Design a protein with these regions (language model features):
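Juxtamembrane intracellular "pre-TM" segments in multi-pass secondary transporters
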Residues: 1-12, 193-223
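Helix-to-loop junctions at the C-terminal end of transmembrane segments
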Residues: 64-78, 165, 267-279, 363
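C-terminal transmembrane helical hairpin of 12-TM major facilitator-type secondary transporters
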Residues: 267, 281-325
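A late C-terminal transmembrane helix in Major Facilitator Superfamily
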Residues: 335-365
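Hydrophobic core of transmembrane alpha-helices in multi-pass small-molecule transporters
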Residues: 23, 104-121, 225, 306-320
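Structural signature of the two symmetry-related core transmembrane helices
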Residues: 81-95, 178, 282-297, 376
Length: 392
């Protein structure tokens, strides 16, 4: 494996810039997302129905905008300029939320700015893949270390978000997020490289080959949506399941999430290290096997000790699919890293939308335990689908 460090320079400054940019954008996002429902309820005085509608519209807008942008990002323009534009939209969005309490403004202009801002992260990973390929670096390990920065950001961001919002107010929270995006703009402008485009795979007629026309890409997308539906159902339902059904302390939910997020980081790095030797498909199947054990354990065990122990399987599941899953899309769509990365992130967003509907319906009609039995079945289905995707 080609090292990320060189003999001439102990640390590659471009590598550090990618790490810093992904971490800071991740922290800025992790500052805003965890307390958004609280902000809408307390500051905007939105009813629960309008809070749910905001999240749904926001997710759908993010999918639509990212698909439209990704279609053009691989064929024209400077990808770094696009990232700068998206970060500028994120900066404006943070300022809007800091000083506006009008629901209609937030669900229209705010959602539009948020959708444009959400493109920044997949485009940074696409630029990183192009840089790694051009400079003959190990793309898998490079992307895995970058993805670990996001996990680290989500270890730090949520507790900091609640601390800022509850102790200093939401204006301070969103101003801090805006400041982080401003620093990111300067960092990206002066440190990230512009990388010449690779030629995308073409179909007869001279047009780029759509990922949807590829059976393996379609199958992997459906499998990825299924995986992220499982994960999001767990995130939504777990705090309620622990406190209402199991009667365990509410603070345990935060401890479980923090433990899993912390364990994901070494899992991602190990997956990146062994990806070339083991193969991406085999790693994804290992992740899904861990996911199957995780959801089966949630359905069958109820003690605090068991739930903590199960987080190891959860970390293996999410730690691998979050990093290797994205790289698998990129390898299946050569020359189109922007579209491939966006397809991966859209599978996450689609899973989030489906999970919200499914979790609410199941838990209300059949109880919280039904959510985990369904997640188990979906994980098995995702395993079967992933096993049929080409190993590249």
């Amino acid at each position: 494996m080609k090292s990320l460090l060189t003999r001439k320079r102990r640390i590659n400054p471009v590598f550090l810039a990618f790490m810093a940019a992904s971490f800071m954008i991740g922290v800025a996002g992790a500052l805003q997302a965890p307390t958004l429902s609280l902000f809408l309820t307390r500051e905007v005085q939105a009813r629960p129905l309008w809070v749910g509608l905001f999240f749904t519209v926001n997710a759908i807008a993010g999918i639509v905008v990212s698909m439209l942008v990704a279609k053009r990002s691989d064929s024209r323009g400077d990808r770094r300029t696009l990232i700068l534009f998206c970060c500028a939209m994120a900066f404006c969005n943070a300022l809007l939320f800091a000083f506006t309490r009008h629901y209609l403004t937030l669900i229209t202009l705010g959602v539009l700015l948020s959708a444009l801002a959400s493109v920044s992260m997949p485009q940074i990973f696409a630029l990183a893949r192009e840089y790694a390929d051009q400079s003959a670096r190990e793309a898998v390990m490079f992307s895995s270390v970058m993805r670990a920065q996001l996990s680290l950001a989500w270890v730090i961001g949520p507790p900091l978000s609640f601390a800022l919002a509850l102790n200093f107010g939401f204006v301070t929270l969103f101003l801090v997020a805006a400041a982080l995006f401003l620093v990111c703009i300067l960092l990206i402008k002066f440190t990230l490289p512009s990388v010449p485009r690779a030629e995308p795979l073409m179909r007869s007629g001279g047009m780029p080959l759509s990922g949807w026309r590829d059976r393996d890409v379609r199958l992997l997308f459906i499998a990825s949506v299924t995986m992220w539906t499982c994960n999001t159902m767990y995130i939504i339902d777990m705090p309620l399941y622990i406190s209402v059904t199991l009667g365990l302390p509410e603070k345990l939910a935060g401890l479980l999430m923090g433990t899993a997020a912390g364990l994901e980081i070494p899992v991602m790095l190990l997956a990146g290290h062994y990806a070339k030797r083991v193969g991406k498909r085999n790693l994804m199947l290992l992740a899904l096997a861990a996911g199957i054990l995780f959801y089966a354990g949630l359905a069958m065990f109820a003690s605090q000790t068991a739930l903590m122990a199960l987080q190891l399987f959860n970390a293996v599941f999410i730690g691998i699919i979050a990093g290797i899953g994205m790289l698998w899309f990129q390898d299946l769509m050569p020359g189109r890293p922007g579209a491939a990365t966006t397809m991966f992130t859209n599978s996450i967003s689609t899973g989030m939308i489906l999970a919200g509907v499914i979790q609410g319906t199941l838990s209300e009609r059949f109880g919280h335990i039904a959510v985990y039995w369904l997640a188990l079945g979906l994980a098995v289905a995702a395993f079967a689908m992933s096993a049929r995707v080409k190993n590249v």
